[in-house]
């Protein structure tokens, strides 16, 4: 029997039992059975003690829940009546009634139960037909499992009994597989179910205020991926369908999901279809439970019984900054700003051509959530969250391979606040100019009605927009990157008729994001904009990436610099490890170098080169980086062999290996964006 609610000493928002860093696992819990894709030496590995394992969370539910509310069922929606003489007419009426009820639940107008009990109603075993119809109304589902979960969370009040949440996720997984049969998940809906389940748990962990021993414990990305993979490998279909053969894609996918969910919590749908912020709704956090109830196939994944499952949204305010203090000071004081690029003869004819790669100017919208505060600098105390030491499963990194082409996980949610997906997002009018390596943002005052349309760049025009703006900013595009949201997000038109995203689809508005990298002044920042059309969003993206690629140095130093630190794969280790006492080796933590381009966003010391030369540099760099990624993967098996003698060493080296891989892969994708933008711009240049 699993522990009762009173026996669980430490529960998070879902009621998931939280383990301290020094908590011990039993021997049976500590063995990880490898899949066919594992090397023989990695068949039995100790699991990570730092995160609540999926196999701990999904315990076999044997105890009944005495406190669960009584949820009414509908006779017309009852599945499995056992009656064989039901006429086709009655069957059609049942289907129609189920569809009607599902539609009313989606609209929030179903009156038989409170909207807070919709999830319990749908998850009730007697209402399978209604649940099926409800999930169909959400189709076509996005190609991202996380975005699918976002759609579900904003469509229904997702606080319910554990087993009811579980049934909803299972049905959603089946529908997702039906919509996307040709992914690396193949027909494995159970595996998708596990991922959705894991994301739900991760959301609770990242965005609640639960503390253990006065410390706020958060799952690391590695721990999240490690434990999700462990649960996947326990599922029979993972091997039967050979899903493990694409595990490198799954690892990439999970890492992107972590980044997105870390920035943007799942919303909590209310009766008025508005999201609740944690700070304003602490009462909603009083109901605790654990996710999960069923046995996942024959793998005996278990869940701890509890009363209800709580999802909630937290005010995920982005850390704000002025991207360049010097630029903004000069901009606000009408002083000239330093040039960021080497001006060439062809620039004069293109620098004022609105709609080109050289210049974009328009009145558009910016997500209020991502809008920076007036004259604010980046919060110094939010540079980085403190890291916690952890012991990780050494099977986690087994088959990671680079993906140099666009994959299923290349969705914009990882770079955006997902305001596009939220009908309650607030937007502000802004005048945007992108030119000469910077983006200028003027936040228009709400009381200004008639705005003079002008794309001029003279001082009089700039002063006019300053006068009608409550705040304005000049951001350097050094190392920035833009993406069009609609390129990568598929939204079901039938999901919510009242949803803004469907209105966006009808009027064909566009959304694009601009990501600014982490630097010494603070963490990564993402701004989200909305344009009149997707075509205009693409033009902004091309212009931003063109200037970012033109002024951003190719980071060769990151890969060519020789360090005396040992990360676990030095030539001496790889060639002479048999004769070395490896226990005397000090393994340092691998981190990318902080280049001048991130220290000084307007630095004059950054080398300015001709456009042709920058294009050539990018072509050579992306080609070379692909070779470096391949070489980094080639040493993986060797590292496993060398460092398997000690868990601590193995963990440190594998963390280093993974960190460097992720850095290289992200750099590869960013430089490809730059390269494409520069190549497109070169088509309009005559030398």
UniProtKB/Swiss-Prot annotation:
Keywords (A to Z) from UniProt: Cell membrane, Cytoplasm, Guanine-nucleotide releasing factor, Membrane, Phosphoprotein
Domain SEC7 residue range list: 57-264
Residues recorded as bearing Phosphothreonine in the entry: 290
Compositionally biased region (Polar residues): 14-27
GO molecular function, one term: guanyl-nucleotide exchange factor activity
Residues the record lists as Phosphoserine modifications: 293, 299
Keyword Membrane: yes
Cellular localization per UniProt: Cytoplasm; Cell membrane; Bud neck; Bud tip
Gene3D superfamilies: Arf Nucleotide-binding Site Opener,domain 2 (1.10.1000.11)
Domain PH: residue ranges: 412-551
InterPro entries, A to Z: PH_GEF_YEL1, Sec7_C_sf, Sec7_dom, Sec7_dom_sf
Pfam families assigned to the protein according to its UniProt record, in alphabetical order: PH_GEF_YEL1, Sec7
GO BP, sorted A to Z: regulation of ARF protein signal transduction
SMART domains per record: Sec7 (SM00222)
Biased composition (Low complexity): 73-83
GO CC term, one of those recorded: cytoplasm
Family from the record: Belongs to the YEL1 family.
Function: Guanine nucleotide exchange factor for ARF3 required for localization of ARF3 to the bud neck and tip and involved in actin patch polarization.
Protein name: Guanine-nucleotide exchange factor YEL1
Gene (UniProt): YEL1
């Amino acid at each position: 029997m699993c522990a009762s609610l009173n026996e669980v000493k430490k529960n998070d928002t879902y009621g998931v039992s939280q383990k301290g860093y020094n908590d011990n696992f039993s021997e049976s819990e500590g063995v990880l059975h490898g899949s066919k894709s594992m090397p023989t030496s990695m068949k039995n590995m100790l699991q990570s003690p730092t995160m609540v394992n999926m196999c701990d969370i999904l315990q076999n539910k044997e105890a009944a829940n005495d406190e669960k509310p009584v949820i009414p069922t509908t006779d017309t929606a009852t599945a499995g009546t056992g009656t064989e003489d039901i006429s086709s007419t009655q069957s059609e009426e049942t289907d129609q009634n189920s569809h009607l009820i599902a539609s009313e639940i989606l609209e929030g107008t179903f009156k038989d139960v409170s909207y807070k009990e919709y999830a319990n109603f749908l998850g009730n075993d007697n209402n399978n037909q209604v649940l099926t119809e409800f999930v169909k109304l959400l189709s076509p589902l996005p190609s991202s499992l996380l975005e699918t979960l976002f759609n579900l969370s904003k469509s229904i009040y997702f606080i319910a009994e554990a087993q009811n949440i579980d049934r909803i996720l299972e049905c959603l997984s089946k529908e997702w597989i039906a919509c996307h049969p040709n992914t690396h998940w193949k027909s494995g809906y159970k595996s998708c179910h596990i991922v959705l389940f894991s994301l739900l748990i991760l959301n609770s962990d990242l965005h609640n205020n639960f503390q253990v021993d006065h410390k706020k414990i958060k799952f690391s990305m590695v721990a999240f991926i490690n434990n999700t993979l462990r649960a996947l490998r326990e599922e029979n279909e993972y091997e039967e369908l050979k899903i493990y053969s694409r595990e490198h894609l799954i690892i990439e996918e999970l890492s992107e999901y972590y980044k997105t969910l870390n920035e943007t919590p799942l919303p909590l749908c209310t009766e008025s279809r508005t999201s609740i912020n944690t700070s304003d709704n602490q009462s909603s956090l009083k109901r605790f439970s654990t996710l999960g109830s069923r046995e996942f196939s024959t793998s005996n994944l278990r869940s701890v019984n509890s009363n209800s499952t709580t999802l909630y949204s937290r005010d995920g305010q982005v850390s704000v900054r002025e991207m360049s203090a010097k630029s903004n000071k000069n901009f606000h004081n009408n002083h000239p700003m330093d040039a960021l690029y080497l001006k060439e003869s062809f620039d004069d004819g293109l620098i004022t051509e609105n709609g080109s790669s050289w210049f974009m100017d328009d009145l558009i919208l910016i997500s209020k959530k991502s809008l920076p505060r007036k004259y604010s600098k980046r919060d110094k105390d939010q540079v980085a969250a403190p890291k916690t030491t952890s012991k990780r499963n050494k099977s986690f990194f087994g088959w990671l391979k680079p993906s140099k082409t666009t994959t299923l996980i290349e969705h914009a949610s990882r770079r955006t606040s997902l305001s596009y997906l939220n009908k309650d997002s607030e937007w502000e009018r802004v005048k945007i100019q992108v030119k000469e390596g910077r983006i200028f943002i003027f936040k228009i005052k709400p009381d200004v009605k008639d705005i003079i349309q002008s794309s001029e760049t003279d001082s009089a025009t700039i002063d006019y927009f300053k006068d009608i703006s409550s705040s304005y900013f000049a951001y350097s595009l050094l190392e920035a990157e833009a993406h069009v949201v609609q390129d990568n997000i598929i939204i079901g038109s039938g999901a919510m008729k009242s949803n803004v995203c469907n209105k966006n689809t009808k009027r064909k508005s566009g959304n694009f994001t601009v990501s600014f990298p982490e630097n010494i002044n603070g963490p990564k920042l993402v701004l989200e904009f909305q344009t009149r059309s997707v075509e205009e969003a693409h033009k902004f993206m091309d212009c931003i990436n063109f200037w970012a690629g033109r002024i951003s140095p190719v980071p060769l130093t990151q890969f060519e610099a020789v360090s005396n630190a040992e990360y676990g794969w030095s030539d001496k280790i790889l060639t002479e490890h048999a004769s070395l006492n490896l226990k005397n080796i000090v393994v340092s933590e691998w981190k990318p170098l902080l280049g001048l381009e991130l220290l000084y966003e307007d630095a004059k010391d950054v080398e300015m080169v001709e456009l042709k030369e920058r294009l050539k540099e990018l072509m050579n760099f992306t080609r070379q980086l692909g070779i470096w990624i391949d070489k980094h993967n080639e040493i993986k098996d060797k590292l496993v062999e060398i460092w398997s003698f000690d868990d601590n060493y193995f963990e440190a080296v594998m963390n280093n290996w993974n960190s460097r891989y992720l850095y290289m892969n992200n750099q590869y994708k960013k430089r490809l964006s730059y390269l494409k933008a520069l190549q497109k711009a070169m088509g309009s240049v005559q030398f």
